[in-house]
Amino acid sequence: MSKSNQMSQSFVMPNDAVRFATMIMTGQGVSNEDAAIIAECLVEADLRGVQTHGLSRLPVYVERVQRGLVKAVPEMKLEKPVAACASLDGDNGFGFLVGRKAMQEAITMADSCGVGVVAARNSNHFGMAAIYLLQAVKAGYFAFVFTNASKAMPPWGGREGLLGTSPFGAAAPAGKLPPFVLDMSPAVAARGKIRLAEKRGEPIPEGYALDENGQVTTDATAALR
């Protein structure tokens, strides 16, 4: 165990972290298979250095299930009007499950048609976009991922949040070399970074956010108001 000025940190093996997160999610009524998918996505984010989309979000997801904001056992429905396009209704389930299923369906369609496009709706936060990009890359495909987001960013010169951060990503296999993976957002920083700073009692870098008066702030709590 190592210690910083703000808090102590414990280091565990990835497999142990996955088992822990799986146990937490099954305790909320999520099936073993789905809980394992969620856990793997969270741990993968931590392993890639994206702590804002890793296990730090586990308490939030648990709370959302308990409050009835997310379905622990969704009944997703796929509509496929043409051979290479489909629409997936996530039934308000976890975004990880919807995203995984949507990309797998896109891969299946690409296997037979050369391309696959899936639009998902009635979903929730799906974590790190790179997860689904890598899913496609491992199958040998180029991939694009886009998602919407609630309004959070003010337009240039404004102070009211009117624009969503709406992350997007692209990836391409590179043979024996590591794949190209782009996972980004129009925002300066993910809101999760600000939440993590607030949790740790740390200031955020200047330029990350504005307070409720439209002034630049380094106070994470003020930035989240």
Language-model region placement:
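Generic N-terminal amphipathic, Lys/Arg-enriched alpha-helix
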Residues: 2-28
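A generic, well-ordered mixed alpha/beta core segment in the N-terminal half of proteins
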Residues: 87-175, 181
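Active-site cofactor/substrate anionic-group-binding motifs, chiefly glycine-
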Residues: 54-107
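Phosphate/diphosphate-binding glycine-rich loops and adjacent basic-rich segments that engage nucleotide
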Residues: 153-224
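Short, well-structured alpha-helical segments
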Residues: 32-43
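N-terminal and secondary-structure boundary signal
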Residues: 26-29, 47-51
